[in-house]
């Protein structure tokens, strides 16, 4: 009988390194490792690939998914102005369905019996991975070694040392950190006390606003049908634009987020995020929509944006409702073309100008000077008709009093 096979989402860290040996030992399965680059620039993917093989993986894939992540995952979320609980721009939550998609793809190519991830049993990511896999291939079984073994950090290190698995050397980072192209998240350690101020060592992409430059910096972001296409007049692909905007806004302390969020699994968790580009691009996109979307479309879209964020946060990227919302949002972006000017200063991003060839803002109708072309006399009839239901209701109530 052929040996079973498992495709593991591999990061190169201790958890997933131990998981390679643990899956082989407990499931008698060959392990295929898959490392996905979603914009964590500090990772040497070739080193990670070789490390997986040295530990015992029969194959080790690395995949540069930055472009796919930017255009197929970040962009739809940006166009939806999705921000979970009005604070979190969904960085880690966005990468999980992409990694799950690639896991399923490799598993199908390899004829694998399982896929596996390195998530704990306490967080949202286990849900995001497993629900995404179920949506894409309901016949694939998902293994969660870290959730199954339930070891302490010390027990995990003991297992690694016993089986010759490399253990990180040096002072252990007190925080749990996740990085991708869209943002950096930080939790655990002192951050578990919601009263404690986040220390500066929790931040890496942004300067403390008090130490930011004493002069503001202005950036101009160009959009075509809701897609950011230029920064300060220079045409850029989305990956490069996001990376540059991180650097520019980060040096002004923009994009720091301290959030106690409601996790899907039922607990509240305190996270610190750094998302400079996400903060600026979402602000700019919203501002461009204010002048390019008709009122009814704009208001209806505003009502959907929080639901979209919840679907993504909760791991329902491949859900039919989310896909239906994508179709609506794509249609809404047809006229979202133009340029937005944003001022960056001491931790704040403030829109100071917006222009579009499709602008619905009419100076002649909005002005109060002599160029005013608004028909003031028409207001009386409009008010009478608009207020008629209220007037009728009030009259009936008064007659019954």
UniProtKB/Swiss-Prot annotation:
Q: Does the keyword Cytoplasm apply?
A: yes
Residues reported in the UniProt entry to bind L-aspartate: 120, 124-125
Q: What is the main EC category here?
A: ligase
Q: Which PROSITE patterns match?
A: ARGININOSUCCIN_SYN_1 (PS00564), ARGININOSUCCIN_SYN_2 (PS00565)
Where does the source fall among the domains of life?
Answer: Bacteria
Which protein family is named in the record? Belongs to the argininosuccinate synthase family. Type 1 subfamily.
UniProt keywords (A-Z) are: Amino-acid biosynthesis, Arginine biosynthesis, ATP-binding, Cytoplasm, Ligase, Nucleotide-binding
GO CC terms of this entry: cytoplasm
State the organism named in the record. Answer: Symbiobacterium thermophilum (strain DSM 24528 / JCM 14929 / IAM 14863 / T)
Residues annotated as binding L-citrulline are 88, 124, 128, 176, 185, 261, 273
Catalytic activity, EC: 6.3.4.5
Metabolic or biological pathway: Amino-acid biosynthesis; L-arginine biosynthesis; L-arginine from L-ornithine and carbamoyl phosphate: step 2/3
- GO BP, sorted A to Z: argininosuccinate metabolic process; L-arginine biosynthetic process; urea cycle
Question: Where mainly found?
Answer: cytoplasm
Q: Which SUPFAM superfamilies does this entry report, sorted A to Z?
A: Adenine nucleotide alpha hydrolases-like (SSF52402), Argininosuccinate synthetase, C-terminal domain (SSF69864)
Can you state the subunit structure given in the record? Homotetramer.
Q: Where in the cell is it found?
A: Cytoplasm
**Which reaction(s) does its UniProt entry say it catalyses?**
L-citrulline + L-aspartate + ATP = 2-(N(omega)-L-arginino)succinate + AMP + diphosphate + H(+)
What is this protein's gene name?
A: argG
Q: Does the keyword Transmembrane apply?
A: no
Q: What is this protein called?
A: Argininosuccinate synthase
Q: Where does ATP bind?
A: 9-17, 118
